[in-house]
Regions:
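Residue-level signal for pocket-adjacent positions within structured domains
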Residues: 1, 57, 98-99
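A short, hydrophobic secondary-structure junction motif
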Residues: 11, 40-47, 74-78
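Residue-level preference for short coil/turn positions at secondary-structure junctions
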Residues: 2, 66, 84-86
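A short, surface-exposed loop/turn module that caps and links secondary-structure elements
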Residues: 45-72
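Arg/Lys-rich, positively charged N-terminal/basic patches that mediate binding to nucleic acids
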Residues: 1-41
């Protein structure tokens, strides 16, 4: 089984920070924020192992660009990534109730 190095774009990092900050400071729930952060770390570790085996995005434009997705293991978030030269690059993190493939496609234009 291949093991991948996982890197996060600045945008993906900013998106994750925004979700964590919202949970911690707007909803005032430190425990939930810590839980999402732990789930992010756990999902990232899993991504190192399974990145090449997960399905491509449904949106044709993202699929053509090689983007795949992984859902957080315990929360309703998703990472959009592609594999470039054997390295996993996460370019977006979204809540699964968002129209995340459309939002991400528009961001790429």
């Amino acid at each position: 089984m291949d093991s991948y190095k996982v890197q996060f774009s600045d945008i993906a990092g900013t998106q994750l920070d925004a979700y964590i900050d919202y949970i911690q400071y707007e909803l005032m729930n430190d425990q939930a924020a810590a839980s999402v952060w732990s789930d992010f770390a756990e999902t990232s570790k899993e991504l190192e192992k399974v990145a090449g085996s997960l399905k491509f995005c449904d949106t044709p434009e993202l699929r053509e660009r090689g983007y795949r997705k992984i859902r957080f293991l315990h929360h309703r978030y998703v990472m959009l990534y592609k594999i470039v030269d054997g390295v996993v690059r996460v370019d977006g993190i979204y809540h699964e109730l968002q129209d995340y493939e459309h939002i991400f496609t528009e961001m790429l234009k």
